[in-house]
Amino acid sequence: MLPNLVILDVTEPRKPSSSAGIRQLTADQIQMLRAFIQKRVKNADDVDDILQCVFLEALRNEHKFQHASKPQTWLCGIALNLIRNHFRKMYRQPYQESWEDDVHTDLEWHGDITHQVDGHRQLARVIEAIDCLPTNMQKVLEVSLEMDGNYQETANTLGVPIGTVRSRLSRARVQLKQQIDPFA
């Protein structure tokens, strides 16, 4: 387990009494804060990033701490705000698989020609399905891919509201799934 952790301050604290609770946390308190974040965020790397940001925000704003609550409660409030911001950011830019992930999979199957043939057939079905989409959906899909999936940049490029981009992409996904695999 982690030993008791004391965050050292190399500068003079603004109020010596106000920073004591925030700057001195035990391993149990840090673990409780980590558990608070883990309940809401499942990705371990994101949990670590958010936890680190909580401490940075707390140190940056320690002069605003009023002692109306426990330092742990104040830190949980900061964590909750950062978690909300994290999910807002994720909503604006959806997850996309990288092509590098496919390279590793292809290397594992390099001796199996049937896998390559199936991949080419599936790619052909996807291209055919995209060609069957209405022009406005094709354009939104194309620009979205060029903008790395960023809805706002796609909307700005096309000169349409962000809601229109989301709607067209959603309908395009549904149509593509139905055309590629009607039994799914």
Curated annotation (Swiss-Prot):
Native source organism of the sequence: Pseudomonas syringae pv. syringae
Short sequence motif named Polymerase core binding, residue ranges: 49-62
PROSITE patterns with a match to the protein in the record: SIGMA70_ECF
Keywords: DNA-binding, Hypersensitive response elicitation, Sigma factor, Transcription, Transcription regulation
Protein name: RNA polymerase sigma factor HrpL
InterPro entries per record: RNA_pol_sigma-70-like, RNA_pol_sigma-70_dom, RNA_pol_sigma70_ECF_CS, RNA_pol_sigma70_r2, RNA_pol_sigma70_r4, RNA_pol_sigma_r2, RNA_pol_sigma_r3/r4-like, WH-like_DNA-bd_sf
Key word Oxidoreductase present: no
DNA-binding region of this protein: 151-170
One term of GO molecular function: sigma factor activity
Function per UniProt: Sigma factors are initiation factors that promote the attachment of RNA polymerase to specific initiation sites and are then released. This sigma factor is involved in the activation of hprD as well as other hrp loci which are involved in plant pathogenicity, hrmA and avr genes.
Pfam families given in the database record: Sigma70_r2, Sigma70_r4
Family: Belongs to the sigma-70 factor family. ECF subfamily.
BP-aspect Gene Ontology terms: DNA-templated transcription initiation; symbiont-mediated perturbation of host programmed cell death
SUPFAM superfamilies tied to this protein: Sigma2 domain of RNA polymerase sigma factors, Sigma3 and sigma4 domains of RNA polymerase sigma factors
Lineage: Bacteria, Pseudomonadati, Pseudomonadota, Gammaproteobacteria, Pseudomonadales
